[in-house]
């Protein structure tokens, strides 16, 4: 462990040995009895809301959790010492599929399984010494919490942000439920890794797309977020500026226009003369209608059956072989007037743009591969000046070349050729050619400038039991009817035998009800909500967790929000963080809060890996539980090791040597503080101007390292903050070894001991509490003690090291007084290299104060 060269302090002092288990057990009991970490609600202090992403209680906590929570705990403790009124809560994201599957496996109820795990996790949290306000702790599976999730759902319904639709959805064959687009990661289910299928289902959605532009624009406000996370969200929202173009479906004769429009979205309207075919996705209803009762239907059905088994990401891969089916029908290009064949292709997705695509094989790799495979025309329409094909087609406005043989699509930026009146214009995104084509489309009412987003509405329906019930009732007479507010919460039945295959839909006691509108028999909706709806507003409930009238009061949220420091893994960059931002904006528009964004500063901590660099996971059996460190070394050792081993945002490999090193430092610092306390006098007046040389140097290190520790703490760089304290402990140890007890400055000894304890208190609080009370005689909890202040002037060294050069080359380095005159510097430098100056005449001396003396001889 770095900086372990702490000099050994004599063990002959009359002070107790460090006993981690006894000390930690003692103070955890005291903190519990005093309810020390209850939020004070002191409006005279500035507020600081520190929050770690709450865990899913699938079992006991692991070292990844420990790192996350230790970072937040250190922030919260230091903020309290810096004079802030701190809100530092914790809870559990308790609904979800793993608990349901585990309950089935163990033949028990999800609620029983979940609460058992929560009880164990809470014990582990408090054994690690985390300063959570236990009075604000809740679980999202508690009816007192999820009632308000249902309440918010109904408010969104009233605002027009909730709707039900039948559409192709991602179906996980393993988990037997649907997945939102965001939950398909790299073509697989985010939770189990299975490849989703496409199914047509009636599902409930939230209109997150209504906030797409604001979600994108407000990323600029998030200066305290990592740029990587902001970029990931911007990419997922995926704003594209382009145009919609209305192609007309030709009748079965392939020529006569019909009233049916096929609208495409493109960012490259300037390439419309290169469109040689139209593409529809296999899921398209129009495609199914076009091939109905035709010779192409069997091939279409086969393509559809295979396409829905492949993930969207894989279907769009540029290197994947393309598959298509001709529909036998044609569309009319609104600019050229020519007809182009309509094909169905598996690389086209229903949820991109309008769902229809114009195929431009000379400008797109996938279109090019498709055209080559099915022998479709490839029309060069954009060329870079100076190329052979440009020289051949320069100024040609009508089609001259409709089939070329090259390795791939041509340039996407260049001069338009074979493009009618637009020939000769420079093409590209936002180019003069693109502007001219869009102007033509708009003028002739066959197209328009528009913006599309990759983001799709949030599908929240889940076909599983262990989730927040959607508070809707279906009546054959009235349709879908919301559950009245005074009937919330809709609670889950606890008598299902999940192991036997029971489902909510089969539970008569749950399903059968009466319509709130007409009073006739009706049925409850049996879908539950995506668990991310529970975690998208929990940070607001912490502000007012016992409110029985509302999810939270506006006054409480005005006091605490936004969260000042939010800590969690980067794997939540899109799902949780995007959804939370959406909920915040909706609740703002409902008049419940005034903020635009929920999290001011975001820290995405790195992962904890095993000694081989592999990610820890239960399935691999390489998880290190906190107890494996706490039992032999203590919680403080674990906390120190976690914070010291690497910057918070970096991954690190778990190493027992780091733990052992952390424990050695704790014991050495323990001895140093006790040894200083032998001379320390809290009542003595400290005056740095009266200190002798050794005391003055220790005081300088105290202030220099104190300033560094404070600065690094404020930046969240705990490893370098700890290094600064280690240097101070080194200096204090040297002072103890070199200065007899009777010669030590009593006020300085107290100040150093006190400040070492204070600076380490957020990191190793049990150790600090014991020393504060027993060694320093304080009766105030360290959590309530002030963070020490340091003086930059006293941090300055009285001496500086300067280089001595002879003819520009460094020959020596000397320690001199910081305010030495040029004459004194010259004399000291000359003496330092006297042997090298023998027989030489000094012709010139150049002095740069504080840096060097250059002698020319």
Model-predicted regions and their roles:
Residues 1-45, 281-284, 294-298, 377-388, ...:
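Basic, alpha-helical terminal appendages of large translation-related enzymes
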Residues 2-8, 12, 17, 25-26, ...:
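Residue patterns forming the tRNA-binding/recognition surfaces of aminoacyl-tRNA synthetases
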Residues 3-4, 8-51, 80-89, 112-120, ...:
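Conserved oxyanion/phosphate-binding beta-strand-loop segments in alpha/beta enzyme cores
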Residues 40-108, 138-152, 266-267, 334-370, ...:
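N-terminal catalytic cores of NTP/NDP-binding nucleotidyl/phosphoryl-transfer enzymes
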Residues 72, 85, 287-385, 390, ...:
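Catalytic alpha/beta core of large soluble enzyme barrels
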Residues 93, 158-171, 239, 449-478, ...:
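Helix-rich, typically C-terminal accessory recognition domains appended to large enzymatic cores
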Residues 209-239, 281, 285-325, 488-514, ...:
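Amphipathic alpha-helical
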Residues 329-352, 381, 512-650:
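Alpha-helical recognition segments enriched in aromatics with Gly/Pro capping
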């Amino acid at each position: 462990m770095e900086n372990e060269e702490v000099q050994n302090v004599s063990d002959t002092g009359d002070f107790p040995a460090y006993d981690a288990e006894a000390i930690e057990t003692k103070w955890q009991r005291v903190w519990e009895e005093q309810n020390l970490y209850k939020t004070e609600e002191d409006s005279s202090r500035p507020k600081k809301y520190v929050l770690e992403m709450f865990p899913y209680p699938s079992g006991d906590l692991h070292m990844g959790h420990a790192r996350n929570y230790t970072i937040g705990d250190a922030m919260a403790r230091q903020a309290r010492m810096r004079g802030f009124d701190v809100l530092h809560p914790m809870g559990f994201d308790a609904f979800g599929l793993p608990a349901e599957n585990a309950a089935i496996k163990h033949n028990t109820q999800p609620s029983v399984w979940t609460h058992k795990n929560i009880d164990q996790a809470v014990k582990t949290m408090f054994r690690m010494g985390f300063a959570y306000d236990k009075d604000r702790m809740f679980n999202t599976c508690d009816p007192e919490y999820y009632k308000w999730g249902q309440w918010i759902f109904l408010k969104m319904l009233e605002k027009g942000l909730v709707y039900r639709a039948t559409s192709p959805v991602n179906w996980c064959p393993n988990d037997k439920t649907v997945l939102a687009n965001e939950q398909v990661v790299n073509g697989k289910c985010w939770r189990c890794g299975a490849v989703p299928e496409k199914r047509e289902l009636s599902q409930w959605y939230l209109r997150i797309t209504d906030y797409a532009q604001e979600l994108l624009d407000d990323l600029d406000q998030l200066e305290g977020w990592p740029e990587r996370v902001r970029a990931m969200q911007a990419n997922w929202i995926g704003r594209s500026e382009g145009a919609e173009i209305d192609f007309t479906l030709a009748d079965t004769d392939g020529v006569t226009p019909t009233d049916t429009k096929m609208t495409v979205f493109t960012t490259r309207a300037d390439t419309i003369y290169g469109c040689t075919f139209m593409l529809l996705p296999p899921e398209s209803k129009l495609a199914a209608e076009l091939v109905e009762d035709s010779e192409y239907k069997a091939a279409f059905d086969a393509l559809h059956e295979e396409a829905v088994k492949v993930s969207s990401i894989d279907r769009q891969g540029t290197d994947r072989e393309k598959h298509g089916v001709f529909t036998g029908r044609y569309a009319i290009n609104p600019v050229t007037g020519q007809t182009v064949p309509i094909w169905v292709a598996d690389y086209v997705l229903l949820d991109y743009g309008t769902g229809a695509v114009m195929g431009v094989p000379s400008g797109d790799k996938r279109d090019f591969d498709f055209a080559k495979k099915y022998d479709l025309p490839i029309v060069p329409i954009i060329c870079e000046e100076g190329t052979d094909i440009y020289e051949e087609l320069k100024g040609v406005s009508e089609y001259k070349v409709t089939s070329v043989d090259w390795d791939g699509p041509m340039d996407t930026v260049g001069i338009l050729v074979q493009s009618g009146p637009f020939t000769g214009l420079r093409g590209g995104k936002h180019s003069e050619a693109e502007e001219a084509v869009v102007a033509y489309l708009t003028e002739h009412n066959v197209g328009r400038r528009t913006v599309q987003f990759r983001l799709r509405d949030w599908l929240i329906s889940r076909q599983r039991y262990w989730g927040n019930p959607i508070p809707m009732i279906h009546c054959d007479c009235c349709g879908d009817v919301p559950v009245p507010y005074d009937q919330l919460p809709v609670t889950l039945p606890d008598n299902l035998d999940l192991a036997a295959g029971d489902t909510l839909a089969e539970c008569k006691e749950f399903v059968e009800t009466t319509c709130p509108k007409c009073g006739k028999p009706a049925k409850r909706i049996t879908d539950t909500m995506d668990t991310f709806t529970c975690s998208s507003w929990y940070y607001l409930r912490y502000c007012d967790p016992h409110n029985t009238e509302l999810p939270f009061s506006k006054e409480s949220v005005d006091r605490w929000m936004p969260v000042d420091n939010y800590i969690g893994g980067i794997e939540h960059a899109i799902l949780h963080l995007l959804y939370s931002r959406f909920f915040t904006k909706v609740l703002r528009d409902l008049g419940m809060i005034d903020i635009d964004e929920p999290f001011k500063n975001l820290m995405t901590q790195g992962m904890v890996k095993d000694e081989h660099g592999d990610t820890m996971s239960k399935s691999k059996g390489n998880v290190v539980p906190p107890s494996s460190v706490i039992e032999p070394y203590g919680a403080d050792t674990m906390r120190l090791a976690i914070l010291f081993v690497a910057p918070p945002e970096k991954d690190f490999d778990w190493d027992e040597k780091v733990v052992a090193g952390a424990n050695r430092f704790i014991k050495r610092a323990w001895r140093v503080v006790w040894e200083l306390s032998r001379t320390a006098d809290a009542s003595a007046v400290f005056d740095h101007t009266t200190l002798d040389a050794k005391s003055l140097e220790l005081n300088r290190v105290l202030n220099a390292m104190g300033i560094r520790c404070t600065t690094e703490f404020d930046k969240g760089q705990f490893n370098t903050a700890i290094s600064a304290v280690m240097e101070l402990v080194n200096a204090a140890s040297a002072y103890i070894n070199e200065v007899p007890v009777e010669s030590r400055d009593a006020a300085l000894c107290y100040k150093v001991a006190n400040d070492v304890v204070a600076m380490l208190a957020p990191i190793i609080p049990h150790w600090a509490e014991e020393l504060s009370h027993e060694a320093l005689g304080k009766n105030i909890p360290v959590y309530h003690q002030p963070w020490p202040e340091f003086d930059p002037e006293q941090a300055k060294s009285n001496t500086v090291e300067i280089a001595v050069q002879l003819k520009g080359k460094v020959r020596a380095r000397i320690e001199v007084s910081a305010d030495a005159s040029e004459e004194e510097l010259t004399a000291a430098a000359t003496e330092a290299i006297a042997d090298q100056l023998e027989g030489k005449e000094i012709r010139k001396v150049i002095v740069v104060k504080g840096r060097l003396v250059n002698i020319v001889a």
